Amino acid sequence: PAEHVGKVRITRTKKFAPAGAAVWNTPGIDLKKGKVFFGTGQSTQSPASEFSDAIISLDLKTGERVWSTQTLAGDAHNVACEVPMARQWGCPYENGPDYDFGASVIKSKTSKEEEILLAGQKSGWVFGLEPNSGQIIWKNRIGRGGTLGGIHTGMATDDKKLYVSN
């Protein structure tokens, strides 16, 4: 939960943190197993959330977290802080690379007919995760990452190949 961590310099109002991490992709649902899964973005303020740059699975009925797999710890980035005047307003001290999971996580099958989650990140990496535990099975870099690079949206699969824009 958010805790009081100081005051905003200009307005002198109370500042609470952490802010968590944004979700800007469409969550996937596994109705048979009763699970929801999605990727998160970076934290926008310090301290960076343990759930930033992560793939998360929730129980569909209760909303309780089943597992969370963070691929990059300490990624707090706020694009407003790239403007010199804005830096005085409490920019994150981590100043991470901004490696969100913007593309929706896809549930698919391996060549051995085993279930797998496929997740693409702005880092340029694609991850294959075990859907029950969130354990990373493999990862493959398909391109250069960055704030405006890597995988933002638009992955698709035919259960034989994964199609990714970069």
For each predicted feature, which ranges?
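Soluble metallo-hydrolase cores and metallopeptidase-like ectodomains found primarily
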Residues: 21-23
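Residue-level signal for short, function-critical loop segments
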Residues: 42
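Extracytoplasmic/lumenal domain signature
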Residues: 1-18, 32-35, 45-101, 106-165
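Beta-strand-rich domains and repeat architectures in extracellular enzymes and scaffolds
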Residues: 25-37
